[in-house]
Each structure stands twice: as structure tokens, then as C-alpha cells.
């Protein structure tokens, strides 16, 4: 699998994991375009909430978020933890 496809698969898996951690799946107020996954200078992924997702985090009292991504051959997996 090409590296760009693996990257996209991990991004998608992470957004799905985050939506499940919120308990809603992908539907208002949790939208794909507002679940931004970035990398720090060492390549570690982190979640940057945007728009209504950011407001939801504040309203729910979420203090920390954690994401982990991995891929192997044709599979991608992601975990998301939201701390209150």
C-alpha cells in the first residue's frame, strides 16, 4: 500500500475513534472536518478540535485527549481517549 493511502487510512481511523469516544459517531456536533489530526515535531499524532467540536469538549469538561495510530500492510487502527 502506498504511504499516502496508509496516511489517509490512519487519519480516517482516528476520526472514527474520536467520534466513538464522544459517544455520537459522526453526526452533529461531531463532524469529520472539525476533527483535525496533526503531528508534533517528532511525528506523534495529536487531536486539534475545531468549531463545534471544540465547544463540545468544553461543555463536556474534557481536559485531555490522546490518540494513537498504527498501520500494517492493508490495515489501519486508531485509539482515542478523552479525559474528564
Tell me what each language-model feature is.
Residues 1-84:
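Core catalytic alpha/beta fold that binds nucleotide/phospho-ligands
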